[in-house]
């Protein structure tokens, strides 16, 4: 587990923050709730690993400097998964079964940042498979991935039907002490065709598009290919999982070819998402 080098002043500030429960709850309610709850939940079985993870979460979610705070929090808990998950890199805290404590942290972090984990290696992979094209992301949520990609030099435009900085978004609820959007996120035009018309020469990025037969993924992909778009970067689960809809996977099977899949993609232990690049046939 990576050690977190904190100055004496920062350690004192964090100690004072957690001791002043009323101020903690007012300034960082989501973090305060996690902090008060985590100790009562079963951990991974490694108390030092759990405490290290919690300290990283506390530090980075209460103003600790970081270019990629989501990654800097979860990187402490990345370990190889079991053989049945192909020994993939995953956030499991050193326990293939994860823990209830880690599952609660997952809820907090996904709501604050993004559902998928943007490791530095996967960000570079996305930039590589984009092959110099700018990216447009539909369903960007808080724009965390768009922010990270732009930060490493991959021009990215972000769109979401409910940008969390100005609309209620149940997946990314507002909370004090939390960044509403990390990247300028526009509301898309009324139809997918209008949106993709200006971006057909971009790579389409769908990162955890809504599942349960919500048609967003399929209608966006259909409009994109109709406009002449040819490059899709998809981060999500396979057919029947928590992301995208059946019509989306039908389109992939009928009209698209899988070019690459990031072998180093880091997932949560309890999810089956992966990062893929598809090309129109």
Regions found by a protein language model. Give the residues of each.
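Conserved SAM-binding loop of SAM-dependent methyltransferases across substrates and taxa
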Residues: 142-154
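A short SAM/SAH-binding and catalytic strip from SAM-dependent methyltransferases
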Residues: 202-215
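N-terminal accessory regions of S-adenosyl-L-methionine
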Residues: 1-118
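Hydrophobic anchor at the start of a short beta-strand
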Residues: 135, 154-157
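Conserved class I S-adenosyl-L-methionine
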Residues: 132-141
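S-adenosyl-L-methionine
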Residues: 159-203
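C-terminal substrate-binding/active-site "lid" region of AdoMet-derived donor-dependent transferases
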Residues: 212-280
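A short, well-structured juxtamembrane/interface segment
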Residues: 113-131
């Amino acid at each position: 587990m990576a050690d977190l080098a904190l100055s004496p002043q920062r350690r004192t500030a964090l100690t004072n923050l957690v001791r002043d429960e009323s101020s903690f709850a007012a300034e960082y309610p989501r973090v305060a709730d996690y902090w008060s709850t985590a100790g009562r939940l079963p951990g991974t079985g490694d108390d030092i690993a759990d405490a290290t993870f919690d300290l990283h979460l506390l530090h980075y979610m209460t103003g600790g400097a970081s270019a990629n705070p989501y990654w800097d929090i979860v990187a402490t808990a990345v370990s190889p998964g079991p053989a049945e998950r192909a020994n993939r890199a995953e956030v499991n805290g050193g326990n293939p079964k994860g823990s209830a404590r880690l599952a609660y942290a997952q809820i907090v972090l996904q709501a604050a940042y993004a559902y998928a984990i943007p490791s530095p290696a996967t960000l570079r992979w996305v930039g590589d498979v984009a092959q110099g094209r700018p990216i447009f992301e539909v369903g960007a949520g808080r724009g965390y991935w768009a922010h990270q990609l732009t930060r490493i030099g991959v021009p990215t435009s972000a769109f979401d039907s409910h940008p969390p900085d100005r609309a209620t978004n149940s997946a990314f609820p507002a909370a004090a002490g939390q960044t509403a959007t990390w990247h300028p996120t526009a509301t898309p035009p009324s139809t997918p065709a209008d949106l993709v018309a200006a971006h057909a020469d971009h790579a389409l990025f769908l990162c955890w598009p809504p599942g349960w037969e919500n048609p967003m993924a399929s209608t966006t992909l259909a409009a994109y290919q109709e406009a002449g778009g040819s490059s899709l970067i998809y981060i999500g689960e396979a057919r029947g999982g928590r992301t995208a809809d059946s019509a989306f996977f039908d389109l992939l099977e009928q009209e698209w070819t899988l070019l690459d899949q990031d072998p180093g993609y880091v997932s949560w232990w309890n999810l089956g998402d992966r990062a893929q690049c598809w090309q129109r046939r």
